[in-house]
From Swiss-Prot:
It catalyses: chlorophyllide a + oxidized 2[4Fe-4S]-[ferredoxin] + 2 ADP + 2 phosphate = protochlorophyllide a + reduced 2[4Fe-4S]-[ferredoxin] + 2 ATP + 2 H2O. One of its GO terms (cellular component) is chloroplast. It is found in: Plastid, Chloroplast. Its EC number is 1.3.7.7. GO terms for molecular function: 4 iron, 4 sulfur cluster binding; ATP binding; metal ion binding; oxidoreductase activity. Pathway: Porphyrin-containing compound metabolism; chlorophyll biosynthesis (light-independent). [4Fe-4S] cluster binds at C100, C134. PANTHER family: LIGHT-INDEPENDENT PROTOCHLOROPHYLLIDE REDUCTASE IRON-SULFUR ATP-BINDING PROTEIN (PTHR42864:SF2). This is Light-independent protochlorophyllide reductase iron-sulfur ATP-binding protein. The lineage of its organism: Eukaryota, Viridiplantae, Streptophyta, Embryophyta, Tracheophyta. Signal peptide: none annotated.
Amino acid sequence: MELRETKVAVYGKGGIGKSTTSCNTSIALARRGRRILQIGCDPKHDSTFTPTGFSIPTIIDTSQSKDYHYEDVWPEDVIHRGYGGVDCVEAGGPPAGAGCGGYVVGETVKPLKESNAFYEYDIILFDVLGDVVCGGFAAPLNYADYCIIITDNGFDALSA
């Protein structure tokens, strides 16, 4: 299977191992010569901690520092190089109870597409929180060619 310009959404409930799976998959594919962008789609913004070694600024933090003018957000402001050459972005989200984190996921793609950075990768992997009610977290499915669901045999994991 040829993986060029492929977008993959990884879903699962919190603590199930989706970020670990996403990071390991991203690094393994980067080691095989693929250009990888991993987008963390969780308000906790901890998806890309493993490849970068630190908590990277989110798209929300960066756009807030520019008075929410997305046209002033450049790829180099939000894309951070991690281990093995994996490029990483974190969507972030509003404070708890202050807005829709899922909306942020959709808005994360906008500046990346407008700057054409979205099209520079062989594989874009969305690491998405899957156990919340907010419908905005389905936004990566609008872009994804494939969806991976990380689960175990517990009822909660399957219903998330």
